């Protein structure tokens, strides 16, 4: 993934908001370090469920409750710090830092190229922070490196096509598409969580019934 990050960062090297990154990256780095130190204490499923709730409420509010949705929000230090910290933490623990990042960046209504470039630069920085911890925890090895290199040509093609599409899509269509994707992806995370929970409950119930049945027979 880091190779794709470098290629994307090079492509958007002149299209990003440096001031926004100066706020977000340090807090996200702290979040990633905390995640590296504590990830074994947290369930990835529960973290993704929480992110699903956050993303669903965020996108639902945009589509159905917010007035003047196209009006840019002012940069807020506290909101940026909190969202970035959560993004760094969940990026390490659940590989899902996109939702908290979007919650801060999307309302700013940056020009679409600047939004994408800022997001790319942000995650490139965070992945660099995470890399030494992944190596230490053996989460990155020669096998995963070879796999990443094998997918590199496809990544380059995807980056090229994505950049071309970004240039032709209208600003409002772009933002509505992003919010729609967040809504759908968040709903899926919530559904997946409850499906897995139901499956576990059903398994426990079946085990309980089996025990009761055996006791009854004896």
Model-flagged regions — what are they?
Residues 33, 37, 41, 64, ...:
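Membrane-interface helix caps of multi-pass small-molecule transporters
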Residues 18-58:
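Glycine/small-residue-rich loop that forms an oxyanion/phosphate-binding "nest" at active or ligand-binding sites
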Residues 19-28, 50-52, 74-84, 117-120, ...:
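Cytoplasmic-side transmembrane-helix entry/capping segments in multi-pass membrane proteins
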Residues 162-182:
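Interfacial loop-to-transmembrane junctions
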Residues 34-39, 89-96, 130, 185-200:
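Hydrophobic alpha-helical transmembrane segments in multi-pass integral membrane proteins
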Residues 36-45, 134-146, 193-201:
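Membrane-interface helix termini and inter-helical loops of multi-pass transporters
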Residues 5-15, 50-75, 163-164, 186-200:
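Transmembrane helix exit motif
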Residues 1-23, 83-88, 98-159, 163:
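Small-residue-rich hydrophobic segments that form or flank transmembrane alpha-helices
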């Amino acid at each position: 993934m880091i190779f794709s990050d470098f290629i994307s960062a090079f492509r958007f090297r002149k299209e990003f908001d440096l001031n926004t990154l100066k706020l977000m990256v340090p807090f996200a780095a702290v979040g990633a370090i905390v995640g590296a130190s504590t990830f074994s204490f947290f369930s990835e499923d529960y973290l993704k469920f929480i992110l699903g709730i956050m993303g669903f409420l965020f996108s639902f509010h945009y589509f159905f409750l917010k007035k003047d949705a196209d009006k840019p929000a002012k940069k807020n230090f506290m909101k940026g710090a909190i969202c970035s910290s959560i993004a760094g933490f969940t990026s390490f623990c659940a590989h899902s830092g996109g939702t908290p990042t979007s919650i801060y960046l999307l309302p700013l209504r940056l020009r679409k190229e600047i939004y994408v470039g800022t997001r790319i630069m942000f995650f490139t920085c965070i992945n660099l922070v995470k890399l030494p911890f992944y190596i230490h925890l053996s989460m990155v090895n020669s096998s995963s490196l070879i796999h990443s290199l094998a997918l590199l040509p496809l990544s380059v093609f995807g980056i090229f096509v994505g950049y071309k599409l970004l240039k032709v899509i209208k600003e409002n269509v772009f933002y509505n598409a992003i919010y729609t994707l967040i809504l759908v992806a968040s709903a899926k995370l919530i559904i997946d969580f409850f499906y897995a929970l139901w499956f576990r409950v059903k398994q426990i119930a079946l085990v309980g019934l089996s025990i009761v049945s055996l006791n009854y027979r004896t």
